[in-house]
């Protein structure tokens, strides 16, 4: 093993390391020699099977101290994020003076604690940010002595300040903002317009990488597209003229990929079973979409995938089963893809979705279908008393339906609005602004992230609503509102929320919780693994780097409010992580520097410009 220290280049050589299980006489001999030669004595504990309880870890650390350790080294094996977080809790206890209770500050040994295994790899870097004097790396990729080790070259790159070129903004003075259209709404509407023979108009159009990706897909299917200011005109070809499409490129969009996989099977059927390939680039190639593959196979479609879940997909033949059942626990997007394709089949289909998740987004799909003239029936079933989240939903979908052209106002994006709503609430709570007004929002949007308003209210913020100028939507239907958020003159308080159906809020909720008094609880961590990054890990690692007190236990994340500080953090090529870290940096005394912010263009290319404006 090589050492990589916080000082980059400082290597601790005068150390001797002995296991906690060593016989007492052996330990005494080594301890005596260490003192004689002026070496640090490291007393180590390793668990190669798992991670002990927190109480056990505390006991181990204290036992290491009683054995004379100048530095306590505790290395566990993490099988999940909860294991890794439990080991990292030792640094909180050390900072609070609770790890070595009763010992004077000068008598407290230093601590190196991290987790082995791929699930714990990030802790080898994070431990340096939390106070460890050094960590362990391998000389090269072929020289690793334990699972999850970084190479020395990788660690030095991660610790080098020159690799964090973007310095975030240091203040927030905005009082009003109009965010762009929802990519969730826009991508559904773009695909529906392609399936409708004739012209559809999509108003309030604002391009981002994911929406442009959908537009390019339907252009490749033969649709004619024109833009008139903020209105997108789509001349759809109709579902029956899609048979010539043999390759679909979805960019980095998980939603677009999942919406198109069932449609690709229909295209294959129209073309006599000829294969259709779906591929993408960037982060989407690292996302395991096994649930989409499994759903297609359940429907009778032949689908091959790299490593049984990774793009590219090769899809052959159409949906042959008239009764289809699969789990929606991991993603509602695959369900939405089926709901958009099943009406095109010759016969009626019954689709049963067990463990449905992100139900508001299913409602959004159903609203889109209704706007484009498609009908279906659904029935929700509950375990026990009716209410809450259904255990399954059964959709009865008539066949031989045709999409009809429609004019749609692409409503503003609540996911994007959440960053400004939280920034406005925190800034007003700190006395920096009077709050913020979100202009031209839809309150019955069915976008799950509208829940941010309820969360802010529970924190003690005031949320008020006023009608927006009717000219904002032109001749398109729908009422728009201006939403004002303020917490002037008061401290925000901790909140509890189940974010299972709105997992995209998790990163910005971590920012909000860090500025609330008390400990906030956010459920739904299990929904975070298959995003642009493993968001459970990235939220934990990057916000802890900025000083946040975060713990993850099972499906719940706990964030205790307290001051954040600046630091060098990584976006992990994840737009929501990048934007949330930038918002966090608005309220830190030192700058927050990021390695990359280009990923923000995926959903919100105007974010930095809107955030920088003072109006």
Model segments located where?
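Short beta-strands and strand-loop turn motifs
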Residues: 1, 42-46, 71-75, 138, ...
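Generic structural signal for hydrophobic
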Residues: 10, 30-34, 63-67, 127, ...
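Ordered, amphipathic secondary-structure segments that act as subunit-interaction surfaces
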Residues: 13-27, 258, 266
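Catalytic alpha/beta core domains of metabolic enzymes, predominantly
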Residues: 21-160
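Single conserved hydrophobic/aromatic residue that forms the stacking wall/gate
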Residues: 2-12
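Active-site glycine- and acidic-residue-rich loops that bind
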Residues: 19-22, 79-85, 113-117, 355-361, ...
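Short, structured segments at the rim of ligand-binding sites
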Residues: 156-615
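Short, structured coil segments at secondary-structure junctions
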Residues: 7, 37, 130-132, 221, ...
């Amino acid at each position: 093993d090589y050492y990589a220290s916080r000082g980059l280049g400082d290597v601790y050589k005068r150390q001797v390391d002995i296991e906690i299980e060593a016989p007492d006489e052996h330990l005494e001999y080594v301890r005596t020699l260490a003192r004689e030669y002026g070496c640090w004595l490291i007393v180590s504990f390793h668990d190669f099977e798992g991670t002990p309880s927190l109480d056990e870890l505390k006991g181990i650390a204290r036992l290491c101290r009683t054995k004379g350790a100048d530095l306590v080294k505790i290395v566990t094996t993490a099988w999940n994020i909860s294991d890794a977080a439990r080991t990292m809790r030792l640094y909180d206890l050390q900072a609070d003076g609770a790890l070595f209770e009763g010992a004077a500050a000068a008598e407290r040994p230093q601590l190196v604690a991290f987790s082995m295994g791929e699930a714990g790899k990030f802790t080898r870097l994070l431990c340096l940010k939390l106070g460890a004097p050094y960590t362990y790396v391998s000389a090269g990729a072929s020289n690793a002595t334990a699972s999850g080790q970084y190479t020395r070259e990788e660690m030095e790159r991660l610790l080098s300040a020159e690799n964090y070129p973007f310095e975030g903004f240091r203040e927030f003075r905005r009082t009003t903002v109009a965010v762009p259209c929802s990519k969730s709404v826009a991508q559904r509407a773009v695909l529906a317009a392609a399936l409708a023979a004739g012209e559809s108009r999509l108003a309030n159009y604002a391009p981002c990488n994911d929406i442009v990706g959908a537009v390019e897909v339907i252009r490749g299917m033969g649709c004619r597209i024109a833009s008139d200011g903020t209105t997108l005109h789509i001349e759809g070809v109709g579902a029956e003229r899609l048979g010539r499409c043999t390759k679909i490129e979805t960019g980095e969009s998980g939603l677009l990929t999942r919406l198109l996989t069932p449609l690709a099977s229909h295209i294959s059927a129209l073309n006599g079973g000829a294969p259709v390939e779906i591929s993408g680039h960037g982060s989407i190639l690292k996302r395991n979409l096994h649930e989409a593959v499994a759903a297609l196979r359940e429907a009778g479609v032949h689908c091959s995938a790299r490593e049984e879940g990774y793009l590219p997909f090769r899809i052959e033949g159409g949906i042959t089963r008239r009764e289809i059942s699969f789990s929606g626990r991991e993603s509602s997007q695959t369900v939405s893809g089926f709901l958009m394709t099943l009406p095109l089949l010759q016969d009626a289909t019954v689709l049963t979705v067990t463990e449905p998740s992100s139900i508001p987004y299913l409602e959004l799909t159903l609203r889109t279908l209704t706007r484009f003239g498609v009908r279906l029936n659904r029935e929700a079933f509950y375990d026990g008393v009716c209410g809450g989240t259904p255990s399954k939903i059964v959709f009865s979908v008539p066949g031989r339906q045709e999409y009809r052209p429609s004019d749609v106002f692409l409503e503003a994006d609540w996911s994007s609005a959440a960053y400004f709503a939280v920034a406005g609430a925190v800034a007003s709570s700190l006395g920096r602004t009077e709050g913020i007004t979100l202009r031209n929002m839809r309150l019955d949007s069915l976008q799950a992230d509208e829940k941010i308003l309820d969360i802010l209210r529970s924190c003690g913020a005031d949320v008020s609503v006023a009608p927006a100028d009717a000219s904002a939507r032109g001749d398109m239907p729908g009422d728009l509102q201006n939403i004002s958020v303020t917490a002037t003159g008061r401290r925000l308080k901790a909140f509890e929320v189940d974010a299972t159906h709105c997992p995209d809020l998790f990163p910005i909720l971590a920012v909000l919780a860090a500025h609330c008094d008390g400990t906030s609880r956010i459920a739904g961590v299990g929904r975070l693994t298959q995003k642009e990054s493993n968001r459970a890990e990235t939220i934990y690692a990057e916000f802890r780097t900025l000083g946040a007190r975060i713990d993850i236990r099972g499906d719940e994340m706990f964030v205790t409010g307290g001051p954040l500080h600046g630091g060098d953090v990584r976006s992990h090529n994840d737009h929501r992580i990048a934007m949330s870290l930038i918002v966090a940096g608005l309220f830190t005394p030192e700058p927050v520097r990021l390695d990359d912010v280009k990923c923000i263009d995926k959903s919100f290319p105007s974010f930095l410009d809107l955030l920088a404006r003072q109006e």
